């Protein structure tokens, strides 16, 4: 005998939505676990591996997120957040002798090498010699900065009397030795050809190349070409569509500034030459999800050669990384 029974069907959309919610929760838990492991690893640096003769860590390490960083450095938080800041882990260090001296060691996790490099380049003293710590470093008797991999590190001293710079260098070396990652520079710096480049002029900019919001994040580098300083830049966009849109917005800006632009079809249909307000001639080209250019040009042909070399270097570097 057939026994009828009722079965309540759920719409497919409802089931799909529930699955999506479950996946989101699982992904959140996974990211949280990974993040927690990363946090504990940096904290261990102050508990298990910090070893500087005559100095000890006071209490527990402190930690700040993008939401709370302003509590520690007030208005300076916006600068770091603009460069992809993930988390700050730090600790206070004092002499084992009980003197009133103090040192603050702050480790900024910037998410990736490019962000850490960008922060360091904008904070560094161009006149100060490198100390050979991490990827690059500089410092004085009471202040030392270095970057390594995705980390940017500041060490600030509050000494009651003048002390040898070696104190901070020992601390920085100890921290650098135990930070994860390597001392290599961001791979994107290889996009700039070496010929006529001004050594050390590379910068990673967050907040607008040439002050343009539509050129938000990218690299710039200075060159000496025929006795004139020229700046090349590479803007990184999320997609080809975004890159094309940025070029169009640039053209709109130039038109509003009463600057004419002429197409450069040899570099593609979205490439042009113009004059940027407050600068000399500028060449802009779009290549994939990048916008590449050079400004302060007094020799257009030399500018074209430089951009052609940059395009070649990008293709070569990208091919090696595959």
Spans of features found by a protein language model:
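Bacterial N-terminal signal peptides that target proteins for export
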Residues: 4-23
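Boundary at the C-terminal end of the N-terminal hydrophobic targeting segment
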Residues: 36-38
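Surface-exposed amphipathic alpha-helical segments
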Residues: 43, 159-189, 297-322
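Structural recognition of the beta-strand scaffold that forms the well-ordered cores
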Residues: 145, 152-155, 284, 291-294
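Short Gly/Thr-rich strand-loop-strand
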Residues: 49, 54-82, 100, 110-149, ...
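Short S/T/G/P-rich N-terminal loop/turn motif that feeds into the first structured element of a domain
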Residues: 223-230, 287-297
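A short acidic-to-branched-hydrophobic micro-motif
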Residues: 81-121, 153-155, 220-246
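Bacterial N-terminal signal peptides
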Residues: 23-33
């Amino acid at each position: 005998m057939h026994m009828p029974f009722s079965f309540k069907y759920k719409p497919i959309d409802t089931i799909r939505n529930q699955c999506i919610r479950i996946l989101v929760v699982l992904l959140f838990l996974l990211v949280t676990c990974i993040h927690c492991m990363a946090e504990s690893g940096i904290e261990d640096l102050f508990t298990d591996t910090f070893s500087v003769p005559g100095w000890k860590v006071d209490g527990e390490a402190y930690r700040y997120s993008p939401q709370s960083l302003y509590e520690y450095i007030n208005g300076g938080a916006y600068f770091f957040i603009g460069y992809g800041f993930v988390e700050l882990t730090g600790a206070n260090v004092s002499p084992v002798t009980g003197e009133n001296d103090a040192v603050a060691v702050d480790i900024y996790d910037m998410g990736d090498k490019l962000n850490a490099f960008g922060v360091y380049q904008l904070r560094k003293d161009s006149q100060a010699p490198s100390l050979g710590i991490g990827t690059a470093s500089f410092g004085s008797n009471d202040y030392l900065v270095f970057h390594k991999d995705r980390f940017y590190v500041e060490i600030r001293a509050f000494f009651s009397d003048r002390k040898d710079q070696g104190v901070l260098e020992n601390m920085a070396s100890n921290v650098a030795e135990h930070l994860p990652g390597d001392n290599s520079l961001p791979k994107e710096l290889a996009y700039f050809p070496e010929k006529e480049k001004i050594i050390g002029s590379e910068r990673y900019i967050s907040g607008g190349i040439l002050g343009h919001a539509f050129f938000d994040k990218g690299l710039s580098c200075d060159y000496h070409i025929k006795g004139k300083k020229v700046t090349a830049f590479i803007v990184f966009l999320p997609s080809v569509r975004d890159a094309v849109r940025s070029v169009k917005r640039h053209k709109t800006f130039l038109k509003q500034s009463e600057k004419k632009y002429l197409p450069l079809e040899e570099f593609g249909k979205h490439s042009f030459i113009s004059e940027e307000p407050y600068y000399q001639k500028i060449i802009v080209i779009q290549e994939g999800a990048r916008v590449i250019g050079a400004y302060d040009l007094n020799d257009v042909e030399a500018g074209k050669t430089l951009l052609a070399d940059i395009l070649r270097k990008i293709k070569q570097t990208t091919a090696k990384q595959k």
